[in-house]
A protein has these predicted regions:
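Flexible, glycine/threonine- and acidic-rich loop/arm segments that mediate assembly and lattice contacts
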Residues: 1-40
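Helix N-cap / beta->alpha transition motif
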Residues: 7, 44, 113-116
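Short, glycine/acidic-rich hinge or "gate" loops at secondary-structure transitions
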Residues: 36-55
């Protein structure tokens, strides 16, 4: 637990008000920082480390299902954020099934990225034309509204090339 104390001498010299205000702001800033770091921790450890109720890390290719199968919420081989990998993720999410193997028709909502990927995300999600080609092709990700809420930059993600799609699946 963080805190601060004011000396009796500071109180006697009437420095309490100026010191208290400065220290209180610093303490609030430290608390806000800690909350952000702890909040990002689940994504920073999504591929290794903390396991959950099914014995798997958050992003795994082998989440066990009741019917004996497994469900994957990540590609078999990690991939950088680009048009192909994002389209593949959108398609994979659309094919997710429930515990009984029934299609749940899930959709991506928002892309979460570290600051290093913000320009890539802008090109992928906000341009009219297809990225990296001189052809006059439409940007299918943008045109189809594949990621309707766009992207959010999380400054507390520690892996500069990790990216995550939030979906409409409730649990």
């Amino acid at each position: 637990a963080m805190g601060f104390s004011i000396t009796e001498e500071a109180i006697e010299d009437n420095l309490y008000d100026s010191l208290s205000s400065r220290y209180t702001k610093a303490l609030a800033r430290a608390m806000a920082y800690t909350k952000q770091v702890k909040g990002a921790d689940i994504l920073n450890n999504a591929f290794a480390g903390t396991t959950f109720g099914d014995g798997q890390v958050l992003c795994s290719t082998a989440h066990p299902l009741v019917n004996g199968g497994v469900n994957s919420n990540r590609p078999a081989v990690g991939s950088d954020l680009n048009e192909t990998s994002l389209e593949a993720a959108v398609i994979q999410i659309a094919g997710w099934t429930d515990e009984r193997g029934l299609l749940i028709a899930s959709k991506p909502k928002k892309l979460v990225i570290p600051p290093a990927l913000q320009f890539v995300a802008t090109r992928l999600l906000e341009t009219e034309g297809r990225v990296g080609t001189a052809d006059n092709d439409l940007n299918a990700l943008n045109n189809n509204g594949s990621v309707p809420q766009g992207y959010a930059v999380n400054h507390y993600l520690t892996d500069t090339d990790a990216w995550f799609l939030c979906t409409d699946v409730p649990n």
